[in-house]
Amino acid sequence: MQKFLLICMTALLFATAAAATRDGIVTEAEIPGATMRITIRDSIDNNKVGELVGWLQATASSVSVVSGRFPNPSPHVVVVPVGRTSWGSSSPVPFGRVTRNGEERIELYINLDRPIEDYYGNWTATHEFSHLLLPHIRDRHKWISEGFASYYQNVLMARAGNYSHAEAWQYLYEGLERGRQSRPDLSLNEAAGAGIRRARMKIYWGGAAIALLADVALRERSNGAESLDTVLGRLQQCCLPADASWSGPRLFRKLDSLLEEPIFMRLYRQYATTPGFPGYQPVLQKLGVVIDRKKVRLRDDAELATIREAITGSLSR
């Protein structure tokens, strides 16, 4: 609660410098390693501006935990207020997307009628901010960009204290199960080719399974010295923000080059062109994520319980 109040008070200071322009309300907020430009496409009172800025700061800062600083030094966030049931949802943030056209811009469509606490409990903004941890990935390998963002949306929500450990693993398990049951006839690359409308769950959660497998393998073999966080931090130092789109193999080869022992292309060769879904169940079992009637129970005496705790630990790397 103290952290929440501090963020809101800091946000109010930034909000006082907000300016009304033809594009809406424009302000800035500092996050680790970056200055975030914020455009709110509506005329709203300063208190609400302050609340929204605080939420955006907290969300972007949670992504900064991956490497210690935000992956883009000057991101632009555009907030678009919409109706209560836009996109057929009453969610506080029913839709978001990232565009890259001369700048990296995160667009978030929000329901202003919801209290600010509901925004903190919603994963959409965390998912969209997490996209900036990677270069833009070409559509034929979209499962990587959407999957890594889907993995991190749950991990980072737990690290920020917006999910409990059990909630984060419950949501991860449910997503992975949706992916496993979606289009078992397709490989991950084929699912990306089929498109979001025909293979959405496989695209989003097949890549999340790869992220989980890589993260656990890196942590286990290095006794916690390496992780998906650390290798993405190295990618950020050398290559982000990136001007051009990357293929999936190019990304995975680059990530492997940042490790003493490669892992990503091995996972790519194993799963990208093979029908079915990455085998994540044995990893969950070793982590102590026990599934009982579709409900997650966490075992602290499991072989890799400390790795599980490190993945979703508060502000942990």
Q: What feature does the model see in each segment?
A:
Residues M1-F4:
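Positively charged n-region of N-terminal signal peptides that target proteins for export
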Residues L6, A20, L240-R317:
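Beta/coil-rich, acidic/histidine-enriched accessory regions frequently appended to metallopeptidases
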Residues I7-A15:
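Bacterial N-terminal signal peptides
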Residues F14-D23:
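Bacterial Sec-dependent signal peptides at the C-terminal "C-region" and cleavage site
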Residues I25-H141:
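Juxtacatalytic substrate-recognition/specificity segment
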Residues N46-A58, P115-Y120, T124, D139-W143, ...:
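Soluble non-cytosolic domains of exported or imported proteins
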Residues V66-V79, P135-K142, A160-A168, A225-V231, ...:
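Surface-exposed patches in mature extracellular/periplasmic domains of secreted proteins
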Residues Y119, R140-A209, D215, R221-S222, ...:
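Acidic/His/Gly-enriched intrinsically disordered linker/tail segments
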